[in-house]
């Protein structure tokens, strides 16, 4: 089977998806078009195919701006998904560094009404950092990227609930402002905080939270019926722009397995 894998076929799929469907935000027209493309490809391979639709609690992070008031400087940022949006003119927060953002990081620190600066290179996962921050009284969270000091910002979601929320856990979604910044910018702010200086930031972060229809292409290749065992292959279709390694590569791999 490995000998039948076509590098050119997979690269063609990756290029097509990233050129035609670069920002596959769940529930968006781009995501819907990508789902139709995948569905048609699966049909061509002779599988039993269905492009399912279902409602999900969704979020579109639209815009953010972060200005450090003292010392004055503007830093690049991206808004997180599933946040409490700020006022259009922005809101001012005192910034407090809390390391990895777990419960122990808040010992003897009062973050009530403030924005916490967290590092995301280790546990707990970012949505849990946001949930803990909100539980501790924080009004906002700023996530510095992990890795080298490159000018890269990751898109992040702070929903704090896996899958669709229910009546039982809807309250677990933190009502908190959230933005992501580069590691370089985060390290500068971290140093200011560790020096004992009062760091104030003006943050504008705009994102919505709404129920919307999303798509899930599924396909079945039936066996000969001699066994109840099955093989499940999956890859998420939705993606932040440009959506190459997350996850056009995964989609191309899934389609190539189906082709073979």
Roles of regions detected by a PLM:
Residues 3, 12-115, 122:
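Noncatalytic luminal/extracellular "stalk/propeptide" segments of secretory-pathway proteins
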Residues 5, 9, 18-25, 45-46, ...:
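Sec/Tat-exported extracytoplasmic proteins
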Residues 9-12, 16, 33, 37-44, ...:
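Extracytoplasmic/secreted proteins, especially bacterial periplasmic and envelope-associated proteins
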Residues 13-16, 51, 95-97, 115-119, ...:
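Structural recognition of the beta-strand scaffold that forms the well-ordered cores
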Residues 23-24, 44, 55-58, 102-103, ...:
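Solvent-exposed loop/turn segments at secondary-structure junctions
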Residues 35-36, 58-63, 124-129, 149-156, ...:
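Extracytoplasmic/secreted cell-surface and envelope-processing proteins
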Residues 74-108, 164-245, 256-260:
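Soluble metallo-hydrolase cores and metallopeptidase-like ectodomains found primarily
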Residues 100-153:
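A conserved hydrophobic secondary-structure block that centers on an alpha-helix together
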């Amino acid at each position: 089977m490995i000998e039948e894998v076509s590098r050119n076929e997979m690269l063609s799929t990756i290029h097509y998806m990233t050129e035609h469907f670069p920002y596959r935000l769940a529930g968006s027209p781009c995501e819907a078009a990508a789902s139709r493309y995948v569905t048609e490809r699966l049909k061509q391979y002779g599988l039993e195919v269905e492009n399912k639709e279902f409602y999900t609690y969704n979020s579109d992070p639209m815009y953010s701006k972060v200005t450090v008031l003292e010392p004055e400087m503007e830093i690049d940022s991206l808004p997180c998904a599933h946040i409490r949006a700020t006022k259009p003119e922005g809101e001012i927060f005192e910034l407090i560094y809390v390391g990895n953002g777990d419960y122990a990081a808040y010992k003897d620190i009062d973050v009530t009404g403030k924005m916490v600066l967290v590092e995301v290179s280790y546990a707990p996962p970012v949505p849990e950092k946001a949930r803990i921050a909100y539980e501790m009284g924080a009004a906002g969270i700023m996530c510095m990227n992990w890795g080298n000091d490159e000018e890269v910002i990751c898109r992040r979601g702070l929903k704090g609930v896996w899958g669709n929320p229910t009546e039982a856990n809807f309250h677990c979604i933190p009502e908190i402002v959230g933005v992501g910044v580069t590691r370089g910018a985060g390290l500068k702010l971290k140093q200011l905080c560790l020096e004992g200086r009062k760091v104030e930031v003006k943050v504008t972060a705009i994102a919505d939270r709404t129920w919307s229809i999303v798509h899930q292409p599924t396909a079945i290749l039936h066996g000969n019926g001699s066994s109840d065992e099955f093989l499940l292959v999956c890859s998420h279709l939705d993606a932040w722009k440009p959506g190459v390694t997350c996850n056009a590569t995964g989609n191309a791999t899934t389609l190539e397995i189906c082709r073979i």
